[in-house]
């Protein structure tokens, strides 16, 4: 199987997001890379599920709270940006201050 660099990047993001989700489910507080991967992978899946750009942006701000991440991580994450594949094409999605 041959994957383009973009496909490889999406796959790595998915895997990192899955690892972060498993850790979160076990009650482990997420570090910075895990936090970004968790949010970004959920945004990718929401776009593929057919949500609009506005819905994905709103959804992204509901995924994690300050209690889900290590101390200081919420202050480090000002925004998460991804290129998500929607039914009508690829679009840039930005979620500002995603951890509330």
UniProtKB/Swiss-Prot annotation:
InterPro entries reported for this sequence: Urease_gamma (IPR012010), Urease_gamma/gamma-beta_su (IPR002026), Urease_gamma_sf (IPR036463), Urease_subunit (IPR050069)
Species for this entry: Haemophilus influenzae (strain PittEE)
Any one Gene Ontology BP term: urea catabolic process
GO function terms (MF aspect): nickel cation binding; urease activity
Keywords of the record: Cytoplasm, Hydrolase
Pathway, per record: Nitrogen metabolism; urea degradation; CO(2) and NH(3) from urea (urease route): step 1/1
Superkingdom as given in the UniProt entry: Bacteria
Compartments in which it is found: Cytoplasm
The protein's name: Urease subunit gamma
Subunit structure: Heterotrimer of UreA (gamma), UreB (beta) and UreC (alpha) subunits. Three heterotrimers associate to form the active enzyme.
Main location: cytoplasm
Catalytic activity from the UniProt record: urea + 2 H2O + H(+) = hydrogencarbonate + 2 NH4(+)
Record's GO cellular component terms: cytoplasm
This enzyme's EC code(s): 3.5.1.5
Similarity comment: Belongs to the urease gamma subunit family.
């Amino acid at each position: 199987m041959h994957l383009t660099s973009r496909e490889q990047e999406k796959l790595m993001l998915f895997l990192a997001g899955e690892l972060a989700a498993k850790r979160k489910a076990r009650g482990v507080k997420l570090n910075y890379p895990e936090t970004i991967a968790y949010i970004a992978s959920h945004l990718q899946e929401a776009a593929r599920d057919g949500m609009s750009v506005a819905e994905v942006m709103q959804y992204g701000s509901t995924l994690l709270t300050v209690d889900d991440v290590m101390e200081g991580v919420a202050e480090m994450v000002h925004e998460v940006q991804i290129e998500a594949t929607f039914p009508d094409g690829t679009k840039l999605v930005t979620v500002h201050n995603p951890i509330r």
